[in-house]
């Protein structure tokens, strides 16, 4: 901070300090604690980005973000179609948690009671949403365990359920769907169903291109898997035609 010029120091000090009772009590430490995000490779360290820190929170965000440690940049991507003039919302906490848990964490860490559309829902709507989000999280563990133990049919059923619930909660973001598509690929690949495995890989590639640069390791790895498996499908089709 002290190596910044006066203009950039002032920009940092304009940011919110959720740990100060009054604006005049803002501190540099409080601003950093409120606005910093952890990096992927440096434990206990984070980055403070002036523009990114301006995004408000929603438990049904319209944007997502990914940190590139090599470039020391945080990239922001749309998590769904966004209307002209619609506010861009990030997410500060685990959006699979219950409304009560999310609100308590946001109040404790950031000093505000969340009034987003998800948290403002009442009655049965709120209960259904909490149940859906809890089930989405549970199914993630179920899919992992079923793939690990070779129960691929059960894993596929859980994958489809998870996709359905994510869409209902408007949480089917490209990064989450990318992971789900990769789970689907693993199921079909282990079962020896080359055509369906490639279908899932194509979905992986499409989702990855919505939030990753094409030169990143994940994108290159998916393309490599596609290149390896497409010829096998052609060979299988030729054999089937001969039969």
Question: Which residues fall in each region the model found?
Answer:
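Alpha-helical linker/edge segments of TPR/alpha-solenoid repeat scaffolds
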Residues: 223-243
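Catalytic cores of histone-lysine modification enzymes
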Residues: 1-62, 109-118
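C-terminal SET catalytic tail plus cysteine-rich post-SET Zn-binding segment of SAM-dependent SET-domain
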Residues: 54-191, 196, 221
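Short, charged low-complexity intrinsically disordered segments located at boundaries
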Residues: 43, 192-195, 231-238
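Boundary/linker segments of alpha-helical solenoid repeat arrays
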Residues: 170-174, 206-222
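Inward-facing hydrophobic residues that define packing positions of alpha-helical scaffold repeats
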Residues: 159, 201-202, 208
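Hydrophobic stripe of amphipathic alpha-helices that form coiled-coil interfaces
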Residues: 165, 195, 207, 214-215, ...
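Eukaryote-specific, cytoplasm-facing alpha-helical/coiled-coil scaffolding segments in long proteins
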Residues: 76-78, 212-214, 230-232
